[in-house]
Amino acid sequence: MESKEILMLIDNISPHAKEYVEKAFENNQVDIIYSVSTVENMGVFIAVDNKDCCIFYAYFLNGNNIEQILDIIKNKTKEYILKFDSKEICFNVYGNNLKIINEVRKLGFKVDVEGYHLEFIGKELPNLNCCNLIDKGFKSDMLKEFINLFDSSYYQLYKDNGWRVNTNAINEEQFYKKLIDLDKHSQVRSFWINNELVGAYIFCQNYITDIVVKPTVQNKGYGSYILAHCIRNMSMNESIRNIRLRVAKSNTGAKKLYERNGFIEIAYFSEHTYE
């Protein structure tokens, strides 16, 4: 299978994975362990090996009747684990390949994150319906409010996934520097009711990295308004196309919100690290 075809398949795991593998091809760091392109199935199992880590990627369009593929994955992965006992080893799988995901976890890989990449495909920009939110950027005297907003908005999601909570309060100085830099490039907007911060968004390049709404004011339409504001800002003021975002698999409410507002799923990933 040619590298171009492989990259098209890896893109279904995530666009970032595709970019990483593309660079690895340029540096001759890709081991094409198995590939198939038939009427019954299309897929690939590769390893990208560099000085820092080894990352496996597996994508198969048809996840049924793949016992032979599972054996190849099991045996080859074991070989690499023995070979690189001191190197970090990761395994990124297409989210619909449940049999492969189960096999990977049997081999000792622990899930880091599972989720989707979505892309805005609306033919027209969303309207900004009348709302009582006041739009601002970020200033240094807003730091405490931003910390409380982001940590409270992500608390339940992070807790449910076993991730560290209250990370912005813990890394206050780092978060502050990040916000100052984002504001300098007009990549962060905050939304207020009177003097209360109730929501915000952050974007980087063509990705919306954060959409947060204060838990006590959720389900009032603020999320849709802030999302629409972000899309319009990125498109009209920054001339950004292919607006995308990443959402955790467990965050079903957010995924539904995005899909109601013109986003479609373009990739589905399940990322693991060997322990």
What are the residue ranges of the model-derived segments?
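Short amphipathic alpha-helix that is part of the acyltransferase structural core
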Residues: 1-23, 129-167
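Active-site rim helix/loop that mediates acceptor-substrate recognition in acyltransferases
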Residues: 11-38, 163-188
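Conserved donor-binding loop and adjoining core beta-sheet/short helix segment
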Residues: 22-77, 197-209, 215
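A conserved beta-strand-loop-helix scaffold within acyl/acetyltransferase catalytic domains
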Residues: 47-52, 163-211
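Acyl-donor-binding surface of acyltransferase catalytic domains
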Residues: 64-133, 137, 272
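Conserved acetyl-CoA pyrophosphate-binding loop and the N-cap/start of the following alpha-helix
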Residues: 65-76, 191, 217, 221-230
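Conserved hydrophobic beta-strand within the GNAT/NAT acetyltransferase core sheet
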Residues: 89-93, 208, 243-247
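Conserved active-site alpha-helix within GNAT-family acetyltransferase domains
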Residues: 95-113, 224, 249-267
